A protein has these predicted regions:
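Histidine-centered active-site microenvironments of extracellular/periplasmic hydrolases
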Residues: 284-341, 347, 351
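Membrane-proximal N-terminal segments immediately preceding the first transmembrane helix
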Residues: 4-24, 454-468, 507, 527-532, ...
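Intrinsically disordered, low-complexity juxtamembrane tails/stalks of eukaryotic membrane proteins
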Residues: 66-79, 91, 120, 138, ...
Length: 986
């Protein structure tokens, strides 16, 4: 009887003399494939930093000095860290406004609006946008967030002197290496979340007031303060700290709004009385807002909308709103919020003109008020709605802003052109010089309106040109990496087809057609020549070394694929010769596989997909079994119920709440499952649907009390959870004896499965019991129940496969009396892979992912509950705590891989062949995550996108290591084959 392989029926067999050579060839090639896979995924993992996280900052531009008289001699920048726009503008419950002084400024002295921040809405990127005029440098993700990772220009750099007081996390970024600055910060210890942090704001003001008072007795300091181009920066951290600790609806946070308003009033009065020249400009704003939960970082309006109030020298006075002010610009701010958003009625400011800006627009505004060159890296647009200047001066200010952005564009263009052999310029700015000349001519002709319009158009084109060169190499790199991944997957498929499947006789008739590369020299030569040409081009373009690696890996893979030209050609002819229903079946398998893998991709952000998955799979699998085997066996019902039980866990919160009663109950549940498994192992073997997985021999076990010992350890771990939690609740220190017992129980219980019987069910039952104690001791809530539910589903998977195996053998034996296994086996009692075997790696992928997402997600890991490691360690030790957390995450993975290994033995399929299919599935997901990497958004969003891609890329190593680890437990599992009545060792 022919045996159906992935791509056909067996027509002939290899000679006995060729089997050793084939084994050696397969072994060498697989070793080489694993090494290649590790290197390839490591190299390609780094590609995202060249594609998505390249710094936009360039150096070497000339400053653009403004051609107008500065309206102000000095400028005061007040930044209320973490102040939400709505909490600043809205009244309190008694209809009194929290910022009376600044509201008076809005109505009588200056201009106001909402400053729109771009995610990540954090303190450092927010201040960089305000003071330097550009948004978060994406390359900072590789260098750390707190410290300033790259050199950049700022308004402070261009000032004659800068005075700054505030947080040690912010002030040193801008003033730490600035020689013409006077600054001070309070100690980190002052940032105590248990207190009202508004005193930090008072500290900053007191330092500045003390400086002014000292100047009356210090002539040198007095002269310094009398200079023009002076910048005063007060960083007011109180709202941020109080928002984190007490939430933005708390009385402490709302009172802090009054504190910063009072500080703004005192700073204004202090300086007006000190200078008495009306030459001081004032800007009050915030770096980001604060969510209702007391956090920030993402693009929610509560985080991106911040107040902006500007008054003093060079600033327009308030203007009533007119009908034309509400025209729809159909434009969006940097946070994707529309222009002309209606002002809430409760703010009572809808009658006064509102001028919203992007956060980076504040930097050119400050430069213009002081008559300074804009920071050379700024991408902000000067908001003319704030500056009070003559029409000619307004055009000059916008032109200076335009030239500064244009200089960045020209510098990037110059750098790229000097390194490119086939340079593609940004065509819309090919005639930028004539546009500048035209603006100058319009200025000379005093046609200021036309000059303004042309300047703004040129500025807009320059910003688009910056984006063009920022993403200049993106398409080539993404295409190269994508082709590399596709080449790797094609190469894997070819290897699996050659090594683990039965193919038609015309492909296998001549052994050398498969194993010997008689005409591969041409392909190798072409690949080497092509790589040499590409390397020379990359070298001449001064490309980074990693660019060479990206291209080399991709070219190498496709060269190897071309080496298999004869095999691919024969395979194509074979497929073309098959019936259409077979091709449809093959295509259907591919489509279903991709759909399942795409659902897994989306499950990384939506855990509830697993609920629907297991509800549907449980029903379909049980119906399928119900039609194939008698319902009295109980297996269809068991499969359905266990899948539905597991589906509940992805509906539960990712942040696991404390519930130690559940942990204790889970210990009982694990013992009951283990006891049931033990009974079935001893008594269910006579049932034909359990045949092969139970311990059939009635011989005395090597360690007759092993099960009782394991059950005892599970019970002890539940008791220790109760005792440890009781001590913590009573605020008592964990006893050393308890700590030692927990370590002993967790460690010793994992060794015991090695001494269990080597029947499939008995060994897996022992592994389940062996890893339960450490998992229970590291659990704080429902994840302990999940452990039992996952174990039940894994048993259901094994029973499902065993039932299918039985039905398949019955059907085949009724069709033919021949020995089904004859000629269909590779070696070591493993058969060739069949088309239907693709369900094994797909099921593994689903269970492997649910082992992680069943109890949380990436965000919940980042904010794990410290009490989960309290039973092992009470003294803060980040490395040991992280190790315990990672080990806890690994335990469900280990269970899944043990079940996977057992199934490959049960079905007599090659485990390494299935491993390559798992990697193939992983790489389909990896390519998707490659295109989902983000360099904008909150740090959590950026970090999660990198984590998703990185984890899938690392799976080639991760799964292999877990295979090696679990092989210690599964290598001697024995399966009894009904057809041969023999035992096979894994």
């Amino acid at each position: 009887m022919d045996v159906d392989g992935i791509l056909g029926n067996r027509d002939s067999k290899l000679g006995k003399s060729s089997i050793p050579r084939r084994r050696q060839w397969v072994k060498r090639r697989e070793t080489w494939l694993v090494i290649l896979g590790v290197v390839l995924h490591a190299v390609y993992m780094l590609s995202i930093f060249d594609i998505y996280f390249k710094t936009p900052i360039v150096h070497g531009m000339d400053l653009v000095s403004p051609r107008f008289s500065p309206p102000a001699k000095r400028l005061v920048l007040l930044v209320a860290d973490g102040l939400r726009a709505d909490k600043f503008f809205e009244p309190d419950l008694e209809a009194n406004f929290r910022a009376p002084f600044l509201r008076n400024v809005i109505k009588n002295q200056g201009r106001w609006g909402v400053s729109h921040a771009r995610p990540p809405t954090e303190s450092r990127p927010g201040h960089v946008a305000i003071i330097a005029g550009f948004y978060e440098d994406p390359s900072a993700v590789t260098k750390g967030w707190k410290a300033n990772p790259v050199e950049f220009d700022s308004v402070f750099n261009r000032s004659r002197h800068t005075i700054s007081y505030g947080s040690p996390d912010i002030v040193p970024i801008f003033c730490g290496a600035l020689p013409h600055s006077t600054w001070a910060t309070y100690p980190h210890e002052f940032e105590d979340f248990a207190t009202d942090a508004s005193f930090l704001d008072e500290w900053s003001f007191d330092q500045f007031q003390s400086l002014l008072n000292r100047s009356n007795e210090d002539p040198k300091l007095k002269r310094l303060l009398e200079q023009d181009n002076l910048v005063v920066f007060l960083h007011l951290l109180g709202c941020d700290s109080n928002g984190h600790a007490h939430r933005p609806f708390s009385s402490i946070y709302l009172n802090n709004v009054k504190v910063v308003d009072h500080i703004a009033e005192r700073v204004y009065n202090l300086l007006e009385n000190y200078y008495k020249d009306n030459r001081t400009s004032y800007i009050f704003t915030a770096d980001h807002g604060m969510s209702d939960k007391g956090s920030h970082g993402d693009g929610h309006p509560s985080n991106t909308d911040t107040p902006l109030v500007v008054w003093g020298a060079g600033v327009k006075h308030p203007r009533p709103v007119t009908a034309k002010d509400h025209s729809d610009h159909v434009l969006r701010f940097i946070d994707q919020h529309l222009h002309d958003a209606p002002t809430p009625k409760e703010w009572d400011l809808d009658g006064i003109e509102r001028v919203d800006v992007n956060q980076a627009d504040i930097a050119p505004l400050m430069s213009t008020l002081l008559g300074l060159p804009c920071p050379v890296n700024s991408v902000g647009n000067l908001p003319l709605g704030y500056v009070d200047m003559k029409e000619e001066e307004e055009v000059e200010a916008v032109l200076a802003n335009t030239k500064q952005i244009l200089n960045q564009f020209l510098r990037k263009s110059q750098i790229k052109q000097s390194h490119s052999l086939f340079f593609k310029p940004f065509k819309p700015l090919a005639s930028y010089f004539s546009m500048l000349n035209q603006i100058e001519e319009l200025l000379s002709a005093r046609d200021y309106k036309a000059a303004m319009q042309l300047s703004e158009n040129l500025r807009s084109l320059a910003l688009k040109g910056l984006h063009y060169f920022q993403t200049y190499d993106l398409l080539v790199l993404m295409a190269t990496i994508t082709l590399g991944y596709i080449g790797w997957m094609v190469f894997l498929v070819l290897h699996v087809l050659q090594a683990y499947t039965l193919l038609p006789g015309d492909i296998f008739r001549k052994e050398e057609a498969v194993h010997e590369k008689s005409n591969t020299g041409k392909a190798q030569l072409c690949g080497c020549l092509f790589m040499a040409v590409v390397s020379v081009l990359l070298f001449l373009e001064h490309s980074p070394p990693l660019y060479h690696a990206y291209f080399a890996m991709t070219i190498f893979l496709w060269t190897q694929i071309l080496n298999e030209y004869k095999f691919i050609k024969a395979l194509w002819r074979y497929l073309c010769g098959r019936k259409s229903n077979y091709v449809i079946k093959l295509l259907a398998l591919g489509v279903v596989s991709v759909i399942i893998l795409e659902l897994l991709v989306h499950s990384f952000t939506e855990r509830k997909l697993y609920t629907w998955c297991f509800l549907i799979v449980g029903a379909i699998a049980s119906i399928y079994l119900y039609k194939s085997i008698p319902w009295r066996s109980g297996i269809p019902v068991f499969v359905c119920l266990t899948c539905w039980f597991l589906s509940l866990f992805t509906l539960m919160p990712a942040e696991i709440p404390d519930n130690n009663k559940l942990v204790n109950a889970s210990g009982v549940m694990v013992i009951v499952i283990g006891l049931t498994g033990k009974w079935l192992d001893l008594n269910a073997g006579v049932n034909r649907f359990w045949f092969g997985i139970c311990n059939h021999e009635k011989r005395k076990p090597r360690f007759p009390m092993l099960f009782q010992l394991q059950a005892l350890f599970v019970g002890l771990s539940s008791v220790m959870v109760f005792l440890s939690t009781s001590h913590r609740t009573e605020k008592q220190e964990l006893h050393t004896i308890h700590q030692l017992m927990n370590w002993f129980i967790a460690g010793f219980s994992m060794i015991l499965p090695l001494f269990s019987e080597n029947g499939l069910l008995s060994r897996l039952n022992s592994i389940f019991l062996g890893f339960a104690p450490p998992f229970l001791l590291l659990s704080i809530g429902y994840e302990a129940v999940f452990y039992g539910a996952l174990g039940l589903v894994l048993i259901a998977w094994i029973l499902f496969e065993n039932s299918l195996l039985y039905v398949h053998k019955v059907n085949k034996s009724s069709a033919s009396g021949k020995n089904l296994g004859e000629h269909a086996f590779l070696e070591n009692d493993t058969r060739y892979l069949q088309l239907s075997d693709m369900r094994i790696p797909l099921t593994f992928m689903v269970l492997f992912n649910v082992a992680f997402f069943g109890t949380g997600n990436f965000a919940s890991i980042a904010s794990f509950e410290i009490s989960s490691v309290y039973r092992f360690i009470t003294v803060f030790s980040p490395f040991l705590m992280a190790a315990l957390l990672i080990f806890k995450l690994f335990i469900p993975f280990l269970l899944v891989i043990c079940a996977f290994s057992a199934i490959t033995k049960l079905l007599e399929v090659p485990r390494i062949g299935c491993y390559f299919l798992v990697i193939l599935c992983s790489d389909v997901m990896t390519i998707h995550f490659f295109f989902l990497v983000k360099n904008t958004g909150s740090w959590m969003e950026i970090g999660n996108s990198i984590s998703h891609f990185g984890i899938m890329s690392a799976q080639v190593v991760f799964v292999l290591l877990l295979f090696a680890l679990t092989n210690i437990y599964t290598k001697d599992i024995e399966i009894r084959s009904g057809s041969r009545d023999s035992r096979k060792v894994m």
